[in-house]
Swiss-Prot record:
Active site residues per record: 1063
Span list, region Disordered: 57-98, 252-284, 693-784, 815-836
Domain of life: Eukaryota
Family the UniProt entry places it in: Belongs to the protein kinase superfamily. Ser/Thr protein kinase family.
Coiled coil: 352-381, 540-569
Binding positions (ATP): 941-949, 964
Biased composition, class Low complexity, residue ranges: 58-74, 83-95, 743-768
Keywords of the record: ATP-binding, Coiled coil, Kinase, Magnesium, Metal-binding, Nucleotide-binding, Serine/threonine-protein kinase, Transferase
The protein, known as: Probable serine/threonine-protein kinase DDB_G0292350
The Protein kinase domain, residue ranges: 935-1193
């Protein structure tokens, strides 16, 4: 025989259990391995609180189950307010979990009571609630909301987590000191519940609870309460009930009218209390005609008789428990009980609205003192919170029921009397679910409710798409709503103020609601991870949806691109915040069929993989594995898909073009292996001579046709709108491309003469840290992902970036990196503009994604606050050293410690410069007046692609000048061309000096310095006659070394300015008779100071870099390759592949590295220097600063003597000019 103690309210007795009964309880509660002995210790060791056995409904239920129910009965989420006292409940919460022996005794007690009185329905209710309590304990604790464990899918593996906080010291987590730890904890199901669900061990207890509740309802005479026709559920108008609630609050006293219903304030991130005015806004904002649709339903039946207020079934908590049990049977055990579940939650909602109305009537009838008013306000707040919870449960259940109904899993539930078409009915259920979730989130804002609202839209869109909805616009509207809500939810949960906001909300919670809030209302990492996963699936549906209207399709493409931007940015921020999301969404984007979206996703994930912040993250290895698989799959897929299209394209070319390709000497097999390069080269060479040929898909960076249509659409829309004043937008400046860390260890090793580089950055940084002057806009970097021409509806993220404190940049500068072909190196710092708040530091790290350059730069947000502070301190400490040179050294690209060449000292490393912004000039750059009478003795020197060059004498000072006369060839009737503002910004001894410019009779006159030594090409030609071009006088290595040294000095200057020449050749290198070498002709020059690689294919045949031909982003490193071609021209008399056809030369330049035909006739230093310049990989190609330290250039002084000797006693150039005199 076994015995145990039980303490009732009025007596103390020992209940004796039979051996058979005890063994049955052991098996039921899994106590086989526990030794149960007679307890002789004091009674408080068994249970510290009393177990009251009152006769009132709610009090009796709460008395036996006070330590195990979800909600407390006094103001907390408990039974309708008819409880005993707050003190006993508080003591119950502070106590540890009561021993299992007490539950066994209670169950035995209820069994005896039912044997004595089979009609004791209250004992049935208590017994069912006891079993429900034990089910909740197995699921993770008494405060776990079963509906929130539904991850809004049909059937998924239940997350596992050892969640034991409900067993010991759960009250300690109520304090704010432990709150931060609770935020990141995943409140999920325990391992035991996971195992019991898989083995269906919970199926019998769940049915047992539902059976006892059903029997109790029948015994109490309330069976008619369940006769709720389905038409009542569908036609139930929540707006009407909400209006009644608003009217009651309007007519109540001022103290009670200001109910603490939480709402989101648009101007603040904190949680505030709202008045009845907010409830009026809620009822007015919800459009009932949109939510409820017309369906042919039978009239609603007469209402059931009024329930007994003393009946257990007047308690909304009891209906909620019943609904929770049915919800578990529906979702996790796949039983068709959704309709019954909806009925239970619906009944709970009805009772809550009636209680609210009844309390309002009692308040109006009675004269209340201050204590009664506080009690009424407390009860009113409790009802509103409980109403929000039940509405959320009902909305989740209706949404799942809607999909199941459409899937025809629940056809057995329909009766012939109702005669409702499923095709319309499931849409009404969805509308009711949206309405319920919207109202729940309005009266009690919660990110968890917002997440379930997004998944309700998502689920309905998937159902429409799965079962062949005719209206693609409807699917697209639903799925974009879902994606937008996902984005807003995650954006708020990932903000820096989120933890502070949660702490404030926790402090505002009553003591009896804190445990429920911590377990169910905190948007923890588990919710964030699942939100990203569901958002990725929704985004996949959005991208795959095709609209019929052409204008809407254009708008959809822009919106899809912005949605992908938002998703990738949020994904990166989540990983950096420590969340471990699913990779399904990003992998799907990386495999997207649209190339722009695919590149954007691969770039962003590649940047994330290279971030040092996630190396120790658990997702890092999986992310790297997935990216490896994606790259392999994309490569194979692209090869397979492009093979047939390449062959078709080649055969569809015009006959002249096919003949041109055959005459080039390239075989079809070679072309097919590198078809994109071949096609780009063919089009580049023949676009002006062979018309009507197809354009390579990647030749131009944008779809002009779509942009034109979009512009026409915007113009038509703007005709009916009033003109608004233009917004002052911050300058757009994307990334400079390389990610590196600051290294000041080798600053003293750089002896490069770079005094012309602006060195204001460090001073600005120092001033920014000390509250000095505001930095100038020319040195600012403001990052915005979209252009200013975007439509207003797509500017949400740009506005957020400029307004939100989350993205405020550091006042002392942001770190930019250069990962394009831009010279290697180190991190550079710049300062922010006046529009950026200096109160927070959030490091923007901007990179290209991988070593293999892609078409576009990628903007990535990486949190490097600690690194920024450390690097800023290092900079301040080394101001004296860095003030002489603005180049910050770094050996990050030489991690393997292997020198780039044995002829370059190991101390010489790659550098990254900070190119200042070049100011765009206007018409004021032109001098006034006409230039014709200002010059005399005008002689034509030569003709170029865009104009002529003349020699003249300036009358004012009799100095010789060169006049470059260009045809006006600019857009939008503006004479300003890039050559003007680029060349006018240059001031260096190795660059032809710009003097002034004029605008005369439709021509642009550019007055330049005259170089009397001619060009390098002229020096190569021994006789200087056009009729004998092959008679060349090749240069000695020392002469080549001198010319290259002078050119490298000029290239260092251009690189410091961020200028790419793009046409460096022998005819554009001018000489003076004093031995100076100067770079001329900036007609094709551009700037990379905007921080992105250029992609335009231009230049002169035989001097174009491989990355330019491959249509990859390039920068100043392309000029180093052109310098190598110039070396070959001076040494060999011809450029690389000069004896081949133009197409073959371009093709081979892009895919092969050039080799000298006879390298043995040159010194090893010369060959090494040449191959460094001609390296096809721009990342391995040295910078001009590094090349200046090459051993080959040590003989440059002797080369200058050779050059001066060639000019001595030579009047050939002057005679040639006089013979070719051409008057103006």
């Amino acid at each position: 025989m076994k015995s145990f103690l039980n303490k009732n309210k009025n007596s103390k007795k020992i209940i004796i259990l039979d051996d058979n009964d005890f063994s049955k309880y052991q098996q039921r509660y899994d106590l086989q391995n526990q030794n149960i002995e007679i307890v002789s210790s004091p009674l408080q060791n068994i249970r510290s609180q009393q177990i009251n056995d009152g006769v009132q409904m709610s009090g009796s239920i709460q008395s036996d189950l006070s330590s195990s129910d979800n909600f407390t009965s006094s103001g907390g989420f408990g039974g309708g307010g008819n409880s005993s006292s707050n003190t006993s409940n508080r003591n119950s919460d502070n106590s540890t979990q009561r021993p299992l022996m007490v539950d066994i005794g209670l169950e035995y007690k209820y069994r005896l009571a039912l044997e004595q009185n089979p009609n004791d329905f209250k004992a049935l209710v208590k017994w069912g609630s006891l079993i429900y309590k034990n089910i909740k304990n197995q699921m993770g604790g008494k405060h776990v909301d079963v509906c929130l464990m539904d991850w809004n899918e049909e059937l998924i593996p239940i997350p596992q987590n050892n969640n034991n906080h409900h067993n010991h010291n759960h009250h300690n987590n109520h304090t704010s000191g432990n709150f931060t730890g609770n935020i990141n904890s995943n409140t999920t199901l325990s391992n035991s519940f996971f195992e019991t669900l898989n083995s269906f061990n919970l199926r019998e207890p769940l049915f047992d609870v539902c059976g006892k509740y059903q029997s109790s309802l029948q015994l109490s005479g309330g069976s008619n309460l369940l006769n709720i026709p389905f038409s009542t559920l569908l036609n139930y108008n929540l707006n009407e009930q909400l209006n009644i609630l608003v009217n009651n609050l309007n007519n109540s006293s001022p103290s009670s009218s200001s109910s603490s219903i939480k709402t989101k304030n648009t101007t603040s991130t904190t949680t505030t209390t709202t008045t009845t005015k907010n409830l009026n806004d809620i009822s007015n904002n919800i459009n009932n005609s949109r939510v409820l649709r017309s369906v042919s339903l039978p009239p609603a039946p007469p209402p059931p008789p009024t329930e007994d207020p003393n009946s257990p079934w007047s308690d909304p908590i009891l209906w909620m428990k019943w609904g929770d049990c049915l919800f578990l049977l529906c979702t996790y055990l796949e039983l068709p009980m959704y309709r019954a579940t909806c009925e239970k939650y619906f009944k709970c909602i009805q009772i809550l609205f009636k209680q609210q109305e009844k309390q309002h009537q009692q308040q109006q009838q009675q004269q209340q003192n201050q204590q009664d008013k506080e009690k009424f306000e407390k009860q009113n707040n409790y009802n509103i919170k409980l109403l929000a919870i039940v509405l959320r449960k009902w909305g989740i259940t209706l949404s799942r029921y809607s999909r199941r109904m459409k899937s025809q899993f629940l056809m057995s539930e329909w009766t012939s009397d109702e005669n409702i078409q499923v095709e319309e009915l499931w849409k009404v259920l969805h509308s009711q679910s949206i309405q319920s979730l919207l109202i729940s989130n309005k009266i009690s804002p919660s990110l968890v409710t917002q997440y379930h609202l997004a998944t309700a839209y998502h689920r309905h869109a998937i159902t429409l798409n799965q079962f062949g909805c005719q209206s693609k616009e409807e699917i697209y509207g639903l799925i974009t709503n879902s994606c937008k809500i996902y984005y807003e939810t995650l954006l708020e949960s990932l903000s820096d103020t989120f933890l502070q906001q949660l702490q404030l909300q926790q402090q505002q919670q009553p003591w009896h609601d804190i445990e429920y809030y911590n377990n169910n209302e905190i948007f923890n990492d588990q919710f964030k991870s699942k939100s990203l996963e569901n958002w990725g699936r929704a985004l996949d549906v959005q991208l795959s949806t095709k609209l019929n209207d052409e204008e809407e399709t254009i708008e959809k493409e822009e919106e899809d691109l912005n949605s992908v931007d938002e998703y990738l940015t949020t994904f990166s921020k989540s990983v950096l915040k420590g969340v471990t999301p699913s990779l399904e969404g990003v992998v799907s984007l990386c495999l997207n069929s649209k190339q722009a979206l695919q590149y954007k996703a691969i770039n962003s994930v590649s940047v994330l993989c290279r971030s040092s912040e996630i190396v120790k993250s658990p997702i890092y290895n999986e992310l790297m594995d997935q990216m490896t698989k994606v790259e392999s799959f994309v490569s194979k897929r692209d090869d397979a898909e492009s093979l047939l299209s390449q062959q078709k394209t080649l055969k569809s070319m015009p006959p002249k073009l096919q003949a041109y390709v055959r005459m080039s000497g390239l075989g079809e097999e070679e072309i097919m292996r590198n078809f994109e390069i071949a096609w780009n080269s063919i089009y580049f060479l023949t676009k002006d001579t062979i018309p009507n040929q197809p354009i390579p898909p990647n030749y131009y960076r944008s779809n002009k046709k779509n942009k034109l249509k979009q512009r026409q659409l915007n113009d038509s829309n703007n005709q009916d709108e009033k003109e608004e004043p233009e917004e002052i937008k911050p300058p757009l400046l994307p990334s400079i491309h390389r990610t590196n860390q600051l290294n000041n260890n080798n600053n003293n090793n750089n002896n490069i003469n770079n005094n012309n580089i602006n060195n204001n950055n460090i001073n600005n940084n120092k001033n920014g840290n000390s509250g000095g002057e505001t930095p100038s806009p020319s040195s600012s970097f403001v990052i915005t992902p979209f252009t200013s021409n975007s439509q207003s509806k797509f500017n949400t993220q740009r506005q957020f970036l400029s307004n939100s404190t989350l993205f405020n940049l550091s006042s002392s500068g942001i770190f930019t990196n250069n990962n394009n072909n831009n010279n290697g190196g180190s991190t550079i710092t710049t300062t922010t503009t006046n529009n950026i708040s200096p109160t927070k530091t959030n490091g923007w790290t901007l990179t290209l994604p991988s070593k293999a350059p892609t078409r576009r730069a990628t903007v990535s947000l990486i949190n490097i606050n600690d690194l920024i502070n450390q690097q800023q301190q290092n900079q301040i400490n080394s101001v004296s050293t860095l003030s002489q040179n603005n180049i910050i050294l770094n050996n990050n690209n030489n991690l393997d410690n292997k020198p780039i060449s044995k002829y370059i000292p190991n101390s010489i490393i790659r550098t990254t410069v900070n190119p200042p912004l070049l100011s765009r000039c206007d018409e004021t750059i032109f001098s006034s007046g006409t230039p014709l009478p200002l010059f005399r003795d005008k002689i034509k020197l030569g003709t170029g692609a865009f104009g002529n060059v003349f020699y003249a004498i300036r009358k004012s000072d009799s100095s010789p000048v060169a006049i470059k006369v260009l045809m006006e060839r600019t857009k939008k009737d503006s004479p300003i061309i890039p050559e003007l503002y680029i060349h006018s910004a240059c001031n260096h001894s190795n660059i032809v000096t710009y003097i002034e410019s004029y605008l005369c009779k439709g021509h642009v006159w550019i007055i330049l310095e005259y170089c009397d030594g001619g060009t390098v090409r002229d020096l190569l030609q021994a006789t200087c006659t056009p009729g004998n071009p092959n008679n060349l006088q090749l240069f000695e290595e020392t002469l080549i070394a001198y010319i290259i040294t002078e050119l490298l000095e000029g290239l260092v200057y251009l690189r410091s300015k961020g200028i790419i020449h793009r046409d460096l050749k022998s005819r554009n290198i001018l000489l003076t008779r004093k031995g100076k070498v100067k770079i001329a002709d900036f007609g094709l020059a551009t700037t990379c100071s905007l921080g992105r690689g250029r992609t335009r294919m231009c230049g002169t045949m035989g001097r174009i870099a491989p990355e330019v031909i491959r249509r990859e982003p390039y920068d100043t490193q392309s000029d180093i390759y052109s310098l190598g071609c110039l070396i070959i021209e001076m040494a060999e008399g011809t450029v690389p592949y000069g004896k081949d056809s133009s197409l073959k030369a371009l093709f081979y330049t892009a895919i092969h590295q050039y080799k000298l035909p006879n390298p043995k006739k040159y010194t090893k230093e010369f060959v090494d220097f040449l191959y460094l310049c001609l390296n096809p990989d721009p990342f391995k190609r040295p910078t001009p600063e590094m090349l200046l330290h090459h051993t080959f250039l040590s003989g440059a002084d002797r080369g200058k003597s050779i050059l001066l000797g060639r000019f001595k006693n030579q009047d050939t150039r002057k005679n040639l000019l006089l013979d070719n005199f051409v008057a103006f």
